[in-house]
Amino acid sequence: MMSIRQRREIRATEVSEDFPAQEENVKLENKLPSGCTSRRLWKILSLTIGGTIALCIGLLTSVYLATLHENDLWFSNIKEVEREISFRTECGLYYSYYKQMLQAPTLVQGFYGLIYDNKTESMKTINLLQRMNIYQEVFLSILYRVLPVQKYLEPVYFYIYTLFGLQAIYVTALYITSWLLSGTWLSGLLAAFWYVTNRIDTTRVEFTIPLRENWALPFFAIQIAAITYFLRPNLQPLSERLTLLAIFISTFLFSLTWQFNQFMMLMQALVLFTLDSLDMLPAVKATWLYGIQITSLLLVCILQFFNSMILGSLLISFNLSVFIARKLQKNLKTGSFLNRLGKLLLHLFMVLCLTLFLNNIIKKILNLKSDEHIFKFLKAKFGLGATRDFDANLYLCEEAFGLLPFNTFGRLSDTLLFYAYIFVLSITVIVAFVVAFHNLSDSTNQQSVGKMEKGTVDLKPETAYNLIHTILFGFLALSTMRMKYLWTSHMCVFASFGLCSPEIWELLLKSVHLYNPKRICIMRYSVPILILLYLCYKFWPGMMDELSELREFYDPDTVELMNWINSNTPRKAVFAGSMQLLAGVKLCTGRTLTNHPHYEDSSLRERTRAVYQIYAKRAPEEVHALLRSFGTDYVILEDSICYERRHRRGCRLRDLLDIANGHMMDGPGENDPDLKPADHPRFCEEIKRNLPPYVAYFTRVFQNKTFHVYKLSRNK
């Protein structure tokens, strides 16, 4: 399969406009230029410098990632088919629709081909705009047609440069979020440096370019930055409206570009629910954010031709349940501590029950089964019952859906990110507990949320939001490695904010009786500067070596297969095989598929299980009948799957099929007592012997070191 081989030779103190001056900092303020005009100029200068650095660091990150991609594959030198093969698995499937739109004679015909597609799933016509999140490919194809770039920029470069450009926006949004939280752009600079030096754990865009998360996460970061600003107290009405607009647009674009949007926003809704229940942010602002989430999802639902999976999402059920519970349960935030605690537990129970009730009702009305594999996976993952379900086990056995590896923390510690994160997290968690206890105890408190009596600890609403956000997404990342990119990028933001926060250093210095306004200033600037110098000293040489290392794409077997398909099979031929390979077949050859990697449809999952019987212990006539039921003309067998050794016993694809079919697994090891020996040998092995029962149904037409292609007989 595809591999990579070595290429052949051929400072001043800043003042934030939104931070109210504290009495302890009066002396520091007096050192700033005096007079209203001077302060305004100083503020403008700070914003200009910080904004310029934000744009520069974002662009540099984008160029850095694009250069790594070029150096790793020699993308500018390889053939078109090799470029397309480099878009592995589902990435190739998504890119194929961009290519399809560009190859259509007109935009109208391109849209029609997506809405009435009969090549992605054989013998079926499906609406791709309803089934998949591919509006970004549609939009990009329209831009490429309209803009005057066709003469000097190939379509594939227009596509990948757009994704790398979004990475610039992503890093800039992280920078701004940290700046908003701490009040200094130095914090944003540190967050960006940490993002780059921890690249292995913060992004995978350079080798999975078309992946949905690479489109979605930049908009998610913009949304978090906008929410952080929105939760500040005493915003001007115009600022508040503009911020709400930014939140809505970023939430909508995030929802439109990733099929897992509803689960990420459910985590956000849980953050809002927690803070609202503990009186740590204004209820009216939480209501606005709940409403924006629902509105964005419903708008996406309309654009996706009323995709039932969106309507049946837990997020919509949860947010509606919160609104209903608020109406039913009055005076939630009054009474003594025990009284309020009891009301809070009752409120939590009511919202949970309403959420499950509404979700079940909606799913029964819509007859929705598209997301049941996710809940089967979660049930098995958290030990709520063993399962032999093929789909659930397919996820359980993938490393990306396993627990976060322990060596991740070693890499994060090398850059000091993990140590700084734990330091800041520990302090803010303690403060959050104190503030929550105070809020629950003091029901007569008439002060605004986030403010407490002078001399007590304080946690601003925007800080509280980012604290609970990082905790919940941390649990998500620890349980599912694929979701670590949502957490590690926010780790950079949260850790850098804490090291540059005057409130954090004030609390820490007061606790050890070393408080002094000058010391706060010294600590909040010297610590991040020292860390930046350390990062430059330790990682700059390695980054330069990485940029100078030249490799090239090398996958001759797959290239040979794609060229053979293009030259020797009819345009309307139907191909069966593994999901990952068939995505490449569609992109490189345009042939019709039996199945594909977009696994969010129940009928497709059933079809995939049937096609995968080519790797199970089944009779040739049974496999032939299953494949022909989907109109299959050719089947591609892969030695890397048939003789797989990458996964442990019980997690190889052939083992999952054996268990699902009730057959004993191959090789030494235990089997469940009720599993029985199969009546037939493994199909993918036995077919290569060219025995009469197999030759009667299958004729080998292509073979190399990796792939075997068989043509199915039609008269059986």
UniProtKB/Swiss-Prot annotation:
Record GO cellular component, one term: endoplasmic reticulum membrane
GO biological process, one term: protein glycosylation
Keywords: Endoplasmic reticulum, Glycoprotein, Glycosyltransferase, Membrane, Transferase, Transmembrane, Transmembrane helix
Chain ranges inside the bilayer that never cross it: 185-197, 216-230
Transmembrane intervals: 44-64, 155-182, 240-256, 263-279, 290-306, 309-323, 339-359, 415-437, 466-485, 488-499, 523-539
Any one GO molecular function term: mannosyltransferase activity
Annotated pathway: Protein modification; protein glycosylation
CDD domains named in the record: Dpy19L3
Catalysed reactions listed for this entry: L-tryptophyl-[protein] + a di-trans,poly-cis-dolichyl beta-D-mannosyl phosphate = C-alpha-D-mannosyl-L-tryptophyl-[protein] + a di-trans,poly-cis-dolichyl phosphate + H(+)
Family membership noted in the UniProt record: Belongs to the dpy-19 family.
Stated role: C-mannosyltransferase that mediates C-mannosylation of tryptophan residues on target proteins. The reaction occurs on the luminal side of the endoplasmic reticulum and involves the transfer of a mannose unit from a dolichylphosphate mannose (Dol-P-Man) donor to an acceptor protein containing a WxxW or WxxC consensus sequence. C-mannosylates RSPO1, a Wnt signaling regulator, preferentially at the first Trp residue in the sequence WxxW. C-mannosylates the netrin receptor UNC5A, preferentially at the third tryptophan of WxxWxxWxxC sequence.
Name the record gives this protein: Protein C-mannosyl-transferase DPY19L3
Species annotation: Pongo abelii (Sumatran orangutan)
Upper lineage: Eukaryota, Metazoa, Chordata, Craniata, Vertebrata
